[in-house]
Amino acid sequence: MQILLANPRGFCAGVDRAISIVERALEIYGAPIYVRHEVVHNRYVVNDLRERGAIFIEEISEVPDNAILIFSAHGVSQAIRQEARSRNLTMLFDATCPLVTKVHMEVARASRKGKEAILIGHAGHPEVEGTMGQYNNPEGGMYLVESPDDVWKLKVKDEDNLCFMTQTTLSVDDTSEVIDALNKRFPKIIGPRKDDICYATTNRQEAARELAERADVVFVVGSKNSSNSNRLAELAQRAGKPSYLIDSAEDIDEIWVSHANIVGVTAGASAPDILVQQVLARLKAFGAEEVIELSGREENIVFEVPKELRLDYKVVE
């Protein structure tokens, strides 16, 4: 049995930055550090940070006075940001991915101009809630669509004054279909100058597609609440290959690979490499003899943490 390893896979720049913010806050200020929502959607990462003193909350009211609070990588609404700023907090750090912030700015700009905005995204996802929460113009409107059917059913105030944005972790193929429907339904709608789906999501989907073409079965390392990990598993399934979204190596049943000659392995953008290595070890225990890493797009993007958390930061008195 041979293992093919997708490339790129695992942590993206936004996830790496968010985790680093929590880790450095713990190092500098000590526990407890409060984090609004899971900083990234990965059970291993969240449990590790929790053991080190991070406390994950959903409501700002759960944070005591004089505490340190961090917003997760998914971003928050303007209302939550204002609520946090009104509290007596020692420090407030924003771990929102800069590429999510870019979409927030697009929505805020539309709100200021009075344009109605349509977001392509999954209802209930924290990134979607945060992005929708950037719009506050009562004269306009903010709408959420998930599918072409949603587009055809949508009613807006002014079809000539529309723009759209997308969640950053969507399926590239599915989103393209929704955008096509938007352009047909609303010919004058304006989209972003550059696709809102982030580079990491796009690259990992391209790598997963190649993996699915060559493997007999595909494993995606990632948690069930991870949007981008789910999209990778769906992509492999659409290619006609059995695919499994797994939190850890222990999730793998040997029967899943009993008839496979080639096993594909990839990981969502919030899954650490240690989990991938554990999966490889388990597959080797099941008889895998060779691991081949596929070629793929090189990623060298780095997002800096806030200056107060940088190792070279000095307080000016």
Swiss-Prot record:
Claim: Transcription regulation is one of the keywords in the record: no
Recorded GO MF terms: 4 iron, 4 sulfur cluster binding; 4-hydroxy-3-methylbut-2-enyl diphosphate reductase activity; metal ion binding
Chain sites annotated for binding isopentenyl diphosphate: H41, H74, H125, S226, S227, N228, S270
Cofactor(s) this protein cannot do without: [4Fe-4S] cluster
Catalytic activities: isopentenyl diphosphate + 2 oxidized [2Fe-2S]-[ferredoxin] + H2O = (2E)-4-hydroxy-3-methylbut-2-enyl diphosphate + 2 reduced [2Fe-2S]-[ferredoxin] + 2 H(+); dimethylallyl diphosphate + 2 oxidized [2Fe-2S]-[ferredoxin] + H2O = (2E)-4-hydroxy-3-methylbut-2-enyl diphosphate + 2 reduced [2Fe-2S]-[ferredoxin] + 2 H(+)
Pathway membership: Isoprenoid biosynthesis; dimethylallyl diphosphate biosynthesis; dimethylallyl diphosphate from (2E)-4-hydroxy-3-methylbutenyl diphosphate: step 1/1; Isoprenoid biosynthesis; isopentenyl diphosphate biosynthesis via DXP pathway; isopentenyl diphosphate from 1-deoxy-D-xylulose 5-phosphate: step 6/6
Entry keyword annotation includes Nucleus: no
Cofactor note: Binds 1 [4Fe-4S] cluster per subunit.
Binding sites annotated in the UniProt record for [4Fe-4S] cluster: C12, C97, C198
Enzyme Commission (EC) number: 1.17.7.4
Superkingdom as given in the UniProt entry: Bacteria
Keywords, sorted A to Z: 4Fe-4S, Iron, Iron-sulfur, Isoprene biosynthesis, Metal-binding, Oxidoreductase
Binding site for (2E)-4-hydroxy-3-methylbut-2-enyl diphosphate: H41, H74, H125, T168, S226, S227, N228, S270
Listed GO biological process terms: dimethylallyl diphosphate biosynthetic process; isopentenyl diphosphate biosynthetic process, methylerythritol 4-phosphate pathway; terpenoid biosynthetic process
Binding residues for dimethylallyl diphosphate: H41, H74, H125, S226, S227, N228, S270
Active site feature: E127
Similarity annotation: Belongs to the IspH family.
Function statement: Catalyzes the conversion of 1-hydroxy-2-methyl-2-(E)-butenyl 4-diphosphate (HMBPP) into a mixture of isopentenyl diphosphate (IPP) and dimethylallyl diphosphate (DMAPP). Acts in the terminal step of the DOXP/MEP pathway for isoprenoid precursor biosynthesis.
PANTHER family assigned: 4-HYDROXY-3-METHYLBUT-2-ENYL DIPHOSPHATE REDUCTASE
Entries under NCBIfam families matching the protein: ispH_lytB, PRK01045.1-2, PRK01045.1-4
Oligomer and partners: Homodimer.
Protein name: 4-hydroxy-3-methylbut-2-enyl diphosphate reductase
Gene name, Swiss-Prot/TrEMBL: ispH
